[in-house]
Amino acid sequence: MPTISELVAEHADENPDGLAFASEREKMTWADYERRSDALAGHLVAEGYGPGDRIAAQLPDGPDVHVAFVACEKAGLVAVGIGPRAGTQEVDHLMSRTGARTLLTDIAGLWGEPPPHERRLGPEDVFLLNSTSGTTGLPKVVVHDQARWFAFHELAVDAGELTNDDVCMSLVSAPFGFGIWTAHVTPAALGAPCVVLSRFDAATAVELIERHRVTVLAAVSTQFLMLLESPAFRPEALASLRVMFTGGEAVPERRAAEFEDRTGALVLQFYGSNETGALSRTTTKDDRPHRLRTAGRVIESMDVRLFGDGQPGCKGPLLSRGYLDDPAANAELFTDDGWMLTGDIVEIDGDGYLTVIGRASDFIIRGGKNVSAAQVEHEVGTHPAVALVAAVAAPDELFGERVCAYVVLRPGHDDLTLGELSDHLAERGVSKETWPEHLVVVDDLPRASGGKVAKGELRADIERRLAP
């Protein structure tokens, strides 16, 4: 099994002028990728960093972050990927937790002679430490080797019928799991170009999709919804798309169908996490109801078992190595007999299709009744005025918790009242227990460094709003 650095070297030799990365400001060929990663690796070795030392990188989501990761691999170092939106508290925490000796925030001018080949990491070596998305509290550190991501890549190639003729675009931050395979691993494995944005902007994404004739898009649910809502969205601009991989958050069926109808691309997803890799996937061969209403069939190479109230545990080649030096967190992540838990509640039907009911921790307990935040979000998201929605628990003296929905409105809609939303849900025949009892209209939803909605901030906000 080749490593990323070996693949980059191969493409630089066979296709030196071929495009490896493009962003809104620059292009990088495979020869550039090889040369720049060689030079940075040489600089790090010359600075005295030894095999296994940890180097943190907090760089914009452009080509440089991939140069840094490959340079660390060539120098025999472990990269610590820190999201570009991480604040100083999170950066300090991750530096301390990993023992990283240096933080790279700009790699311009860091050049040296390429290190000897024998220093390079192998596919089974730890090459990356990244973090959980940190939607609540400080993030944990996840340990990765390349072998798991190449196994993931093979599944992605099969699911989306990917080839080296494709042009990829990843809108997901590279240090996180979704971004690792869509921007760092799969383009290198295919020898295909990848378009990345230093910071997500829907209009810029549309423009670059059209300019580079992107065929494979990777975006979390919120991002593809923002593409749909952007004034810059034009079906002809996205006509080159074949498939879009999404996930990381619940995928709203109605809006996913709208994306397919307006672009002609098939919406696909993997279900899993940074820690587990993937448990299930949809493919181009699945029919539309299964693609958009489920998280796909359980992956054959993964052993999946449901515990208790439907929480899946898994074993198999896609797993990470768990959390770094964190026995307490690993005790929660793994069962005593070695099953890695996802923290979700799911159902698996007789044909092997998996449906996510919600996070085990993402339920609102109203008067002793568990209400799935994901179900609330799905139903609220069907209102024609709603672009984005997040449901959280609001504290309540009588019931303990009540359902609170934060919504971002679609262009052309100036307001939405709780009464109007309730009328809509009543017309749909939605069970009253899932109706929001608090509604907050906001301009945007807060994001954790990994791009997911920071529900901890929303819970704190509604507590402040309701405080006497």
Where would I find each of the regions flagged by the language model?
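Conserved ANL (AMP-binding/adenylate-forming) active-site segment centered on the GW(Y/F)…HTG consensus within
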Residues: 264, 288, 292, 319-343, ...
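Conserved AMP-binding A3 loop
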Residues: 29-31, 127-151, 277
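Conserved AMP-binding/adenylation subdomain of ANL enzymes
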Residues: 150-167, 175-216, 230
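Conserved pre-ATP/AMP-binding loop-to-beta segment of ANL
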Residues: 16-17, 114-131, 138, 161-167
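AMP-binding/adenylate-forming catalytic core of the ANL superfamily
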Residues: 217, 308-310, 316, 321-322, ...
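Gly/Ser/Thr-rich phosphate-binding loop
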Residues: 189, 214-219, 228-289, 303
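Conserved AMP-binding/adenylate-forming core of the ANL superfamily
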Residues: 9, 17-62, 66, 70, ...
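Short beta-strand->loop structural element characteristic of the AMP-binding/adenylate-forming
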Residues: 56-58, 65-69, 73-102, 140-143, ...
